[in-house]
Amino acid sequence: MESRVVFESDLNLKATELRLGLPGTEEKEDNNLRTHAVLRNNKRQVRETSQDSVSISKASHHQQHVETVSAPPPKAKIVGWPPIRSYRKNSVQEGEGDGIFVKVSMDGAPYLRKVDLKVYGGYPELLKALETMFKLAIGEYSEREGYKGSEYAPTYEDKDGDWMLVGDVPWDMFVTSCKRLRIMKGSEARGLGCVV
């Protein structure tokens, strides 16, 4: 039995003890300091013995005389976290000043384009831009005849998912309801609006 006591004293358990604290510092068991820390952090403490309850009541009485400690200030946001790519950061900062971009596809063309509807003031400007973009002639729109004299007819998909001819509704309504544009062959666009 004595050899066991000697063995425990040789191990230097204090040096190899795992605890929550900085290395090289001594932690003193002081009930008053512990209760002050608990009161300052607004956390409850588990009562272990009746002596602890007496010291806690003394500490709370002492706390009334000490100036009240305010809650710590909120943590500052870390700059650069979460990581955002620069193009997304710029687009978030610009906000609603951005344009209304819609995809434009053309039957027979192997590529898509995007156009900003806010750039154009009306249908004639948009149609002129589409003609130069896809190198085709769309022609003039009339409510009776649609796009007469053209092999293609510009159509758009509205919010409801319906395909309509470009020019059927007023420009402002078109800008707010257009989801995407498609330049169809005239034969496919016959049932959408007027006879082409």
Curated annotation (Swiss-Prot):
Expression triggers: By auxin and cycloheximide.
Location of the protein in the cell: Nucleus
Role description: Aux/IAA proteins are short-lived transcriptional factors that function as repressors of early auxin response genes at low auxin concentrations. Repression is thought to result from the interaction with auxin response factors (ARFs), proteins that bind to the auxin-responsive promoter element (AuxRE). Formation of heterodimers with ARF proteins may alter their ability to modulate early auxin response genes expression.
An example Gene Ontology biological process: auxin-activated signaling pathway
Protein name per the record: Auxin-induced protein 22B
This protein's encoding gene: AUX22B
Classification via SUPFAM superfamilies: CAD & PB1 domains
Domain PB1 residue range list: 99-186
PANTHER family linked: AUXIN-RESPONSIVE PROTEIN IAA17, AUXIN-RESPONSIVE PROTEIN IAA24
